[in-house]
């Protein structure tokens, strides 16, 4: 239809991330108004103009969890069978053909039942050890995709469109579920000052730009301070970022 942008999604599961700029507490009514105009509906209802009533959700304690913690707490049988189930609903890409042929040897693939005979010894302890080791390996593997922007570091291509870079994909999924491609957004990070000392809230810093970072028309850049846990830092002036619109 006119005025509608078509986006093809190759899987049955998808998600949408939307950012709305908030310029302070007095700006909340504007944000609420924008949120009130957001709707998710079948295309047929949009075209017909009929009023669409979305199905009401329900709370389930079973689904009340932090996704990454849930995955990391799974035993190997649960993990691989859940992957097999999800691959039925979300078909692997054509580029995954070679990998699928390899892992099919232990019954990992769409609709399969994981071959538990490959699990030997102390399964729980071996799985726990492997998870620890593989996370360290993923971090190491991810470094080859790290790029420099002055003193800042960011993860570069093929982030957001990983193709067969499975380790890179897993690292991003572990740390943040998903990521934009570099054409859409960059997330440079810095942890040391100009002298190589670790940044700390006990000191004051000056961030100097020769010129503002270039962005496309309508874009923006911001500077945000995060703690060691990668969450925002509570502070007495209630300041969480500096935002510049272009």
Where are these regions (language model features)?
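A compositional/structural signature for long, glycine/proline-rich flexible linkers
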Residues: 1-244
């Amino acid at each position: 239809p006119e005025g509608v942008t078509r986006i093809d999604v190759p899987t049955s599961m998808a998600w949408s991330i939307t950012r709305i700029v908030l310029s302070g507490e007095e700006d909340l009514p504007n944000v609420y108004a924008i949120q009130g105009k957001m709707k998710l509906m079948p295309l047929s209802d949009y075209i017909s103009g009929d009023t669409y009533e979305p199905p009401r959700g329900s709370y389930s304690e079973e689904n009340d969890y932090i996704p990454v913690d849930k995955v990391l707490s799974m035993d190997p049988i649960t993990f691989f069978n859940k992957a097999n189930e999800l691959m039925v609903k979300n078909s692997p890409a054509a580029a995954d053909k070679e990998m699928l042929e390899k892992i099919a040897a232990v019954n990992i693939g769409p609709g399969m039942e994981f071959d538990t005979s490959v699990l030997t010894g102390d399964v729980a302890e071996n799985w726990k050890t492997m998870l620890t080791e593989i996370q360290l390996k993923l971090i190491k593997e991810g470094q080859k995709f790290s790029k420099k922007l002055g003193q800042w570091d960011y993860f570069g291509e093929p982030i957001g469109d990983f193709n067969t870079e499975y380790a890179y994909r897993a690292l991003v999924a572990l740390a943040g579920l998903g990521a934009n491609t570099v054409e859409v957004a960059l997330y440079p990070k810095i942890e040391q000052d100009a002298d190589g000392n670790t940044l700390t809230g006990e000191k004051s810093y000056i961030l100097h730009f020769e010129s503002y970072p270039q962005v496309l028309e309508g874009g923006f850049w911001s500077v945000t301070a995060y703690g060691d846990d990668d969450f925002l830092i509570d502070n007495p002036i209630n300041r969480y970022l500096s935002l510049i619109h272009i």
